[in-house]
Amino acid sequence: MLITTQNLSIHHQKDLRPLVADLTLTINSGDKVAIIGEEGNGKSSLLKTLLNPDMVADYLLISGTIQRHFTAPIYIPQSLPLEMAELTLNDHFFSQVDLDIDFGLLYRYADQLAFDSDRLSSDQLISSLSGGEKLKIQLIKSLAKHSDIIFLDEPSNDLDLDTLSWLENYIATSPKTIVYVSHDEDFLAKTATKIVHLQSVKKKMLAKTSVQTIDYQAYRDQREAAYYKQIQQAQNDRKEFEKVMEKHRRQKSQVRNTLLNTHDATAGRLVAKKMKSVLAREKRYEKQAESMTKMPYHEDAIHLFFSDIQPVPAHKQIIDVQGEELWCHERLLVKNLFMKVKAGEKVGIIGANGVGKSSLIKFLYQHLQTRSDLQLGYMPQHYADLLPLSKTPLTFLAGEKDKEEQEAALTYLASLQFTREEVHHAISDLSGGQQAKLLLLKMVLDKANVLLLDEPSRNFSPISQPYIRELFSDYQGTLICVSHDRRFLREVCHQVYKLSKQGLYRLDSI
């Protein structure tokens, strides 16, 4: 075994909110352990704690025991470390001789991930890479190192479909132990052999942590079946208990009436004795009620919908791009871009990492911003491009003065599982999923009738994913998105296009 925990509990230092409760976990050699849970429930915190508690000591309180029996861990974080951004690719791969790296493997992984090996020694700044390419270079270098355990935080984020398939196969077939956080249901279904589920219930005052050595789909099915079985049992118990109590109330009422109407002392003593017996029986029933099957705690996910939007008339053209060029940092990405989208259409865009998908969404956003006939909603790849990180969720949505708007915003935030403390935290302190919820809520409040979304589902938990797909599937406006989420593309988008250097072309299937 590589990791064992006993009664591991984790709390936030700031507000003492529980994230992990009494986790007893064994991670053996070869296990593929997926950590899942709602946004802001502490998945990344648990991952770092299992790797090295010193990484979280500044903001978390940890109790219980953790034993580690690994010597060569690899860790790829959710976001590119700041110190890497201004390095060149040559710096990243070759500036220091690392004896743990198998360079033959490194070049093989670069080839398999369609990352031109000539670029490995180039002076291109890492900051100029696309989100998917930044993750690729970390995978290429890290996986070529000697290791006995791998920690990955949202490894499927930003990856194109080919790389995603490669990573799924790597995890599924690797003899190494891999512990990872993921939101991608297809990815989880193809890779996980053990599930650690972090839940937060009772308005985030109670943490529930469960572990199952089982694949993800079986876990979902088992959890859903157990949930509804417990509901049924709890309802049956209450129904039977109510029958017993109804009979008891009738008997108690009869004895009370008899007692009130008895004037004979001897008969009165007998009736009083009977009342004492009835009251004793009532106390027994109250104790029985405590042992009845409890209604299961349910962790709500996303409860949100677009209402009262004014759709653009169906005949109207939203996008009409004819033979334009797409540039990024003085680099020509696409030289002959044609794109037409009519009102009401839902279009998905896929393509290789670095081809320009996020640049295309930005281009369309700039193109549509000046249109007075549209109410535009936008979710960029990097939330900080739009979110004022120093503000709180409440002031971002409702400003600081309008009380009515603030009350409405508080109601919406509560429906998205923000606590009263979290609505006053700086946006920079929120998880990626919580920041995504804020952008989503902003679009709803703005009654946006055209949405431009860059990877809209990537930071939402597997529990929230079906709600997200339903939200956008029911949406009555126009939607254009970049996504590598296969379920999202299948269930939401009417058409899917692939972007390449030559332009966009329509796919029959994905």
Set out the residue ranges of the language-model regions:
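Conserved H-loop
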Residues: 184-190, 485-491
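Coupling and communication elements adjacent to P-loop NTPase active sites across diverse families
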Residues: 1-12, 101-125, 222-330
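Walker B catalytic motif
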Residues: 154-155, 160, 453-456, 460-463, ...
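Conserved beta-strand
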Residues: 5-8, 15-28, 64, 321-325, ...
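ABC-family P-loop ATPase nucleotide-binding domains
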Residues: 71-134, 145, 238, 381-442, ...
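Conserved beta-strand-loop-alpha-helix hinge in the C-terminal portion
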Residues: 201-232, 499-510
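Hydrophobic anchor residue at the start of the ABC signature
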Residues: 139, 440, 468
